[in-house]
A protein has these predicted regions:
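A short acidic-to-branched-hydrophobic micro-motif
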Residues: 54-55, 131
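Short, P/G- and charge-enriched loop/turn segments at secondary-structure junctions
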Residues: 69-75
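Active-site/binding-pocket entry motifs
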Residues: 52, 59-62, 137
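Vicinal oxygen chelate
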Residues: 1, 44-45, 86, 92-147
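Short hydrophobic/aromatic beta-strand micro-patches
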Residues: 9-11, 85-89
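A short, polar/proline- and glycine-enriched secondary-structure boundary/capping micro-motif
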Residues: 64-69, 141-143
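Eukaryotic phosphotyrosine signaling hubs
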Residues: 5-7, 79-83
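Core segments of cupin and vicinal oxygen chelate
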Residues: 11-53
């Protein structure tokens, strides 16, 4: 039976640019490199605190990533699509640090149901990234309730 997610794979348009983004901007480290020349695929695994992402480069054409949909929440438009969510201790400090590294946020951080704070940005491939700060008193087994 399933125990846990091993890694998340992301097909990139520019493998080197993606590796630089995840290592230099988000602080991941390279943990493995795989070359499959016979099929035209290169993969670089990056890791941080046990979370792994496989960045893949392909010599053929990469289909355009879905634009997703947008929902209105708290008076702001929030993109809703396939995404990766990173837990942070201090959303404001993390957003400031990433803005200092040239990251643009589509909207300012906001607080949602249950006191959770969120913010969104995209990686160089258009993959939606979400930052999430849980309230200090809450444990990690938070249930999400859509109302």
């Amino acid at each position: 039976m399933i125990k846990t997610i091993d890694h998340i794979g992301i097909m990139t348009n520019d493998l080197q640019k993606s590796v630089e983004f995840y290592t230099d901007v988000l602080g991941f480290s390279i943990s493995a490199k795989i070359e499959m020349e016979e099929v035209g695929l290169s993969a670089i695994f990056i890791e941080k605190n046990g979370s792994k992402i496989e960045l893949m480069g392909y010599r053929g054409a990469i289909p355009k990533r879905s634009e997703g949909i947008e929902i209105i929440m708290g008076g702001s438009s929030i993109p809703l699509n396939d995404h990766i969510t990173f837990t942070v201790d201090d959303l404001g400090a993390t957003v400031s640090e990433l803005k200092g590294k040239g990251i643009e946020f589509g909207l300012e951080p906001m607080q949602v149901e249950g006191g959770i704070k969120i913010a969104f940005f995209k990686d160089p491939n258009g993959v939606l990234m979400e930052l999430m700060e849980h309230p200090k008193q809450q444990n990690k087994s938070t249930e999400y309730i859509i109302v």
